[in-house]
Amino acid sequence: LTPRPATADGPAERLVHPPDRPTRLAPGGTNAVGYTLGLLSDEWNLLILRYAIAGARRYADWRDALPISHAVLTRRLAYLTEMGVFERTPYQGGNRLAYTLTKRGRDLWPVLLTIWAWEAAWVPVHVERLPRMVHRGCGRDFTPVLVCAACGRPVEPRDVAGAFGPSGSWSRSVPAAATRRRSEPTGAAGMFPETMALIGNRWSAAILGAAFLGARRFRDFAQWLGAPPATISARLRTFCELGVFTQEPSPGRPDRHSYRLTKKGRAFFPVAMTALAWGQRWFRAPEGPALVFTHRGCGQDFHGRLACDRCGTPLRGSEVLVESRS
């Protein structure tokens, strides 16, 4: 029996998630990708983290900022604490507890930045204005750019070759429990409406990942993922409606179609890569990494980092100012 990965509705079994060092995963169990999706494919988690990055610490900070029930907020904060993202620290003389981002939690800043940048560029309508991002190093508003850590050049999906590593497989990479969007519909789109359409369901996230790894035909997605055909059809249709995939007739078979990432879909690559990088730093399988990447341009193992599009220098979390817009 392998440990069940934690989800937003329940803690992990038997695994310890230290706030300052990686989780040691069980052999043959859910890998880093599965744990990462279990945590990030939940809109409430992302919203809680968004405000934590901006300075929220007390329960009341999130309660006042979000249309969230007491039960859901309590459950999500407990889950993120269990996963080592928050730690409880006393304040007001020890009578109350604050939720402080740990080293593991603070390390999520690249994921949030790339989500905000993608939503700002490709999604026209948001209930709440996306935050302003300022690079303290050059003093200007910026958009993060994904570059190769080895050579410093910007990369797109076609520039990076990916494959499963020693702990990688589709069965180990999909969270055991279905992930979901908000537990309580508010009647309006969230801060990350299309991000959650892409990764807010375990099969959606898996289909997007398969597309980045080269899946094109319906048969590719079905064979690689093992998802129900109706589920794959529904997700492919949604991705086409969002403009993330384009549907094209297969050569010589006009009755069949292939699915290719559009410019909008390819622009989501930094989100996927920063999320995977965070997961593989903080969830370690004994067999080795779940995914390995090579930069075709320089031939080195690919490890991404974010750079400022205005001055070109690598970004550090301490040099990024996140401000709410009035």
What are the residue ranges of the model-derived segments?
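N-terminal helix-turn-helix DNA-binding core of bacterial DNA-binding proteins
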Residues: 31-69, 190-228
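DNA-contacting interfaces and partner/effector-binding or oligomerization modules
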Residues: 71, 78, 82-87, 96-150
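Residues in the helix-turn-helix
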Residues: 72, 231
